Design a protein with these regions (language model features):
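Active-site-adjacent substrate-binding region
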Residues: 41-129
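Acidic/histidine-rich catalytic neighborhood of metal-dependent amide-processing enzymes
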Residues: 1-45, 82
Length: 129
C-alpha cells in the first residue's frame, strides 16, 4: 500500500480484506530517532500500536542479509494507513517502512540512498527479481 490519505484518516479505510499489509510511507529523522535520510526506516510501533512482530522481524532480516541500510524506530506521534484499516475493522497483519525523511510537511528532504533502500526492501519482501 502506498499511502496517500493517512493524514485525513481514511487512506486504508476502504481496502479489500487481505491477510497482510505493508505500508510504504516516510520514515522520521530526528534527534531521538535512529534513522537517517540514507536508510529505510522499519517502524516497530507508532501511535496506533505495535506492528506485526513477524513482519517487522522479516523486514529486518531481509535488510540485514542483503546489506540494505536500515533503522528500526518507534514513532509515538505518527500513524499510518494501516492504523486506519485496523480502525475500519480490517483484521490483517501490518508493517510500515519508508525512506528516512527530514522535516516532514514543511519541506520534506530525503536522499536517493534512502529511496533505493526502501525500494530494494519492498522488492525483497515481495520476492521480486
Amino acid at each position: 500500500m502506498w499511502p496517500g490519505h493517512e493524514e485525513v484518516g481514511h487512506g486504508g479505510a476502504t481496502l479489500p480484506q487481505v491477510d497482510e499489509l505493508l505500508a510504504v510511507d516516510m520514515g522520521c529523522v530526528g534527534d531521538d530517532l535512529s534513522c537517517t535520510e540514507r536508510q529505510v526506516s522499519i517502524c516497530a510501533k507508532d501511535n496506533g500500536g505495535p506492528y506485526d512482530y513477524g513482519m517487522v522481524t522479516r523486514l529486518v532480516e531481509l535488510a540485514r542479509a542483503n546489506a540494505i541500510p536500515y533503522a528500526v524506530d518507534i514513532y509515538p506521534h505518527y500513524s499510518s494507513d494501516i492504523t486506519v484499516a485496523w480502525h475500519a475493522g480490517m483484521d490483517a497483519r501490518g508493517a510500515l517502512i519508508g525512506p528516512g525523511v527530514h522535516a516532514s510537511h514543511g519541506m520534506e528532504r530525503t536522499h536517493f540512498e534512502g529511496m533505493k533502500a526502501t525500494i530494494d526492501l519492498v522488492a525483497l519482501y515481495l520476492e521480486l527479481d
